[in-house]
Amino acid sequence: MRRILTALAAALMATITALATATPANALAITAGFMITSGGRWCTVSFPDPQNPTIVYTAGHCYKDGITEVSLGNIKIGQFIPEIHDPATDLIAIRLYSNIPSEYSLMSREPLLDPWVPNEGSTVCKYGATTQETCGTVLSVDDTKFAVQMPADHGDSGAPIYERLKPGSKGVHVVGTVISEDPRRPGVIYCSTIGAINNFLSQTWGTDWDMD
């Protein structure tokens, strides 16, 4: 428990630092990788909706029935939308309050580029609220989920998984989101593919939803 609380304190400091170093115009802009809390749980923002800046997404299991308020530290930023919740991809939408903007990027301000399909053996990274950026190898892939050898901890649920064209390049290609750790294989996490998320959100919004 002490290790988790220490990690949580470090994550809060990272979020505060990101806000402090942002320009005034977007100092509170919610990006992929931000830590959010609700009902005593903390999770990670997966990504803002590229077509609707008032919507962001996170892991569905972060929603506790009856508790819709979502906060960033002591700032109330929005509410879960229980109607936009998909157990299959473990995704849920959050509607931001009118005074809370979003930015289509990582916390590092790297823009989110067109999504990619994860491939077995490729190197991917994630930005989680607790462990920040860690990278690892894709172990297996199917139509809706994939497994990655990668460090993660409580609070990283919902974190975006992405690839870079090359080290130091500006912009990342999202390939999925973190669901959970594998209880039988330490250091392995399960993720939803961006393709499965795309299908769910296209049906939900009644349009050809895409991260492009």
Each model region followed by its residue ranges:
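Catalytic histidine site
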Residues: 28-99, 140-212
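Ser/Thr-centric signal marking residues that sit
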Residues: 15, 44, 58, 130, ...
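Short, catalytically relevant binding-site loops at active-site mouths
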Residues: 99-101, 131-132
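Secretory targeting and sorting signals
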Residues: 1-27
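Solvent-exposed, flexible loop/coil residues
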Residues: 5, 67, 116
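Short, structured beta-strand/loop micro-motifs enriched in basic residues and often containing a Trp
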Residues: 100-110
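Flexible, gly/ser-rich surface segments that form the specificity/activation loops bordering the active-site cleft
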Residues: 109-153
